[in-house]
């Protein structure tokens, strides 16, 4: 743990404690100098309870394809993830998550990329250039809605400062968001340069922290605590042996369905419940709000270009639908996909106008197994975001975690555990 003190005009000294967790995860809890007990209790109020199992560990096996070794987006070689979780006082529950396609200079070694929009009620900065040029040139960062401009500005600063970028005059930061305003002081715009730099610099391969971490700290899904989730699928050698990894930031609603079982309905928490039962919506509960958004980040080592990456991203929406998402008017549903295939990197030097690419690409016919892989990985990543999240309090509101024991009972009842 590293503790740094900062001066403040309005407060006394601020104490910022940074805890390094899995895959570069960091928690920043800021309090006025009231002693370590108050700092500890603040973090405990926001993220209470012991670590919870992932969906597969609890017996929920999704689909037919096997997961990668970590069952995470980091199963795609070279991909790393970093989180900064911001917990301050009683009202700040937010953060930043960074996904790096590789560990080099992304501007000088761009990766093929694409964005697919399921519903465009969102602020995905940088998406138009990605789809125009078919390239991603910065880390993919996720945050809270009103933090997008601040995070984008910080990503630009980070990229401009990299050795080799001294002559760069245009940067396209790719920043996704969901609205965490129910639990978080969203108007405070608490993620800035320091947090973004920390998320990028702390990014690591290996196991990825899930649940109430990074950009998922203050999110809500299906009326329960949402967050960050990840999963992967590995194709057999006969199909190329490629890996597809997915990371999600869940903050949307609907009627939670797990492996086809009506979990949300049997838990009594689902979209339109009040209208269907009382014919009125004068006092709708949290689960009755389907809005909020989801960002789906997809990585693969398969050699596919922008066109087929966009097709891959589109199929992730089928995995989203499998979970019971309502696809509401107010939910910004976005998928970002990139390939890490080294032969497809767009290498740019100061004078590279005549660069040619001649890499072999997968055919359209070879895409179908990858489509199934991304559907399954997206579905399981969403479940992991719910299974790993913990009950969280912020801004006077408490959002309960998905009750795992009761959920497993429902799944057993419907024969939805295992294969």
Please annotate each region the language model reported.
Residues 1-13:
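N-terminal secretory signal peptides that target proteins for export/translocation
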Residues 1-4, 20, 36-37:
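Low-complexity, intrinsically disordered short segments enriched for Gly/Pro and polybasic residues
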Residues 3-4, 30-32, 43:
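Ala/Thr-enriched low-complexity intrinsically disordered regions
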Residues 19-30:
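Bacterial N-terminal signal peptides
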Residues 31-34, 126:
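An N-terminal domain-start capping segment
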């Amino acid at each position: 743990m590293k503790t740094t003190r900062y001066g403040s005009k309005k407060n006394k000294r601020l104490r910022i404690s940074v805890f390094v967790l899995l895959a570069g995860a960091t928690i920043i809890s800021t309090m006025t100098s009231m002693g370590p007990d108050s700092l500890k209790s603040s973090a405990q109020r926001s993220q209470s309870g012991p670590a919870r199992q992932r969906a597969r560990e609890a017996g929920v096996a999704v689909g037919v394809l096997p997961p990668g070794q970590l069952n995470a987006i980091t199963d795609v070689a070279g991909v790393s993830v970093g989180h900064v979780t911001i917990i301050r006082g009683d009202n700040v529950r937010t953060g930043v998550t960074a996904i790096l396609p590789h560990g080099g200079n992304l501007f000088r070694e761009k990766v093929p990329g694409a964005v697919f929009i399921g519903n465009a009620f969102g602020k995905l900065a940088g998406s138009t250039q990605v789809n125009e040029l078919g390239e991603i040139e910065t880390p993919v960062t996720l945050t809270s809605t009103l933090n997008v401009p601040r995070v984008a500005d910080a990503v630009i600063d980070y990229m401009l400062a990299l050795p080799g970028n001294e002559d760069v005059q245009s940067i396209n930061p790719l920043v996704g968001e969901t609205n965490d305003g129910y639990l978080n002081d969203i108007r405070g715009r608490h993620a800035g340069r320091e947090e973004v730099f920390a998320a990028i610099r702390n990014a690591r391969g290996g196991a990825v922290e899930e649940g109430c971490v990074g950009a998922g700290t203050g999110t809500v899904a299906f009326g329960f605590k949402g967050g960050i989730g990840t999963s992967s699928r590995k194709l057999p050698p006969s199909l190329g042996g490629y890996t597809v990894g997915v990371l999600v930031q869940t903050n949307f609603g609907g009627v939670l369905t797990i492996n086809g079982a009506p979990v949300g309905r049997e838990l009594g928490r689902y979209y339109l419940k009040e209208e269907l039962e009382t014919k009125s919506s004068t006092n709708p509960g949290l689960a009755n709000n389907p809005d909020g958004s989801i960002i789906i980040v997809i990585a693969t080592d398969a050699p596919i270009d922008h066109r087929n990456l966009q097709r891959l991203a589109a199929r992730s929406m089928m995995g989203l639908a499998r979970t019971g998402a309502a696809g509401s008017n107010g939910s910004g549903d976005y998928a970002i996909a990139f390939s890490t295939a080294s032969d497809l990197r767009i290498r740019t030097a100061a004078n590279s106008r005549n660069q040619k690419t001649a890499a072999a690409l997968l055919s359209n016919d070879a895409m179908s197994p990858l489509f199934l892989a991304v559907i399954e990985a997206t579905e399981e990543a969403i479940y992991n975001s719910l299974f790993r999240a913990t009950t969280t309090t912020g801004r006077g509101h408490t959002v309960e975690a998905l009750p795992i024991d009761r959920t497993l009972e429902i799944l057993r009842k419907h024969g939805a555990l295992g294969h």
